Amino acid sequence: ALCPLLTDGAIEALLTAGSDELKATYLEKLVSGQWTGTMNLTEPQAGSDLAAVRTRAEPQPDGSYKIFGTKIFITWGEHDMAENIIHLVLARVVGAPEGVKGISLFVVPKFMVKPDGNPGARNDVHCVSIEHKMGIKASPTAVLQFGDHGGAVGYLVGQENRGLEYMFIMMNAARYGVGVQGIAIAQMAYQKAVAFARDRVQSRPVDGSLKAAGPIIHHPDVK
């Protein structure tokens, strides 16, 4: 569920703030599921303090940016279950204001997109490790390195220095999804507990209503 959840957030961010060119390049295949999306905020030295983001973006003559930095705890940050991964990355344009007021949002594809719309050459973004987690093991959580070989190509979403505003579009979508996921997990846990209690035979009721051991669901502590 986490992979389409994040992809949906990327779709919403591009629909809201992306240029016509970005929409034409990425939306169709994100919506179809051929490509997946990620959300890149957290950094090793900053944690969730986005004011301390150091990933930098250097403007290029063609209107693109070169992205340099490290992002951690990236859900579905690396996998081969889709043709391309479209990373939405918070970074600071060189010379931007300090703090959260100087953060911008960029599209950084795993593979560059060719004129025919298909994935082309590998972009300069690489997975350097996968987290070993206690749970949610079907979802790869990655550390991503941008720009080790000259700079990852990124494309500005919306306007410079408004990245946090745009990222909240993704974050709010994710919050709704995680809330629904929590309700679903709790409901499933309850159903399994009830089924177990109905099948588990454990001693006779203290009120003597049964002569032999019965299901533990009749125990006062379980009722």
Language-model region placement:
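Alpha-helical interface subdomain recognition
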Residues: A1-L5, G9, A17-G18, S32-G33, ...
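Active-site lining segments that contact anionic ligands and/or coordinate catalytic metals
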Residues: Q34-T36, A52-R54, D62, N84-I86, ...
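Flexible, glycine/threonine-enriched loop-and-boundary segments that flank and lead into catalytic domains
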Residues: T38-H79
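Short Gly/Pro-enriched turn/cap motifs at secondary-structure boundaries
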Residues: Q45-S48, E78-D80, P97, K133-P140
